[in-house]
Amino acid sequence: MNVLRTPDERFASLPGYPFAPHYHQSAGSLRMHFLDEGRRDAPVALCLHGQPTWSYLYRKMIPAFVAAGLRVVAPDFFGFGRSDKPEDEATYTFDFHRNSIVALIEALDLKHITLVCQDWGGLIGLTIPMDMPNRFERLLVMNTTFGTGDAPLGEGFLAWRAFSNSKPDMDIAALMKRAVPSLSDGEAAAYAAPFRRRSSTSVWRRASSPMTWQRLRVF
């Protein structure tokens, strides 16, 4: 398997992101990045990002959660952030992403979890608590849905799928500025830091495929 690993210097001095990186070996030889802030014995806020973002999305929420007495674990899905990026688009199945989060929860033995999820972090993350009920206590759900795979896809989703498939070299910084005009140029560039070339972006084309949506029927 050919795997991209974004150089560490791409993540140097990102605005508002002073957190130390942590890594978990998962899915064979692949390396998943996650943030781990706060007391290790505290209840956990497990923060799952969407696309095309990464754990940088939670940079302002992490200090607030820690100040409230929580341990914050914020992984980057494979293909995003500082996590490894397999070049083969077929790798990025729904189960691949879901299983990687389950493996991280088990490896860190996370308990008393509040699932904090947004966008695809919710579509993936919301299928997990019912299989691990003794580990989860609360949900904080933002801008997402619990997909069942049997409802017609919304116009917004179809528009995003068409857009992402037609823009293999998508300008992530410009996209984020359009979505959140208040972002500084440095913050917008930070969202784009993990993605160096076209093969880095195959993950979100796969995520929005009809096959992925149909997989949600199982849950």
Where are these regions (language model features)?
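Flexible "cap/lid" subdomain of the alpha/beta-hydrolase fold that forms the substrate-access gate
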Residues: 1-21, 32-39, 44, 57, ...
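Short hydrophobic signal-anchor/transmembrane segments that target glycosyltransferases
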Residues: 64-66
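The serine-hydrolase catalytic nucleophile loop
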Residues: 51-62
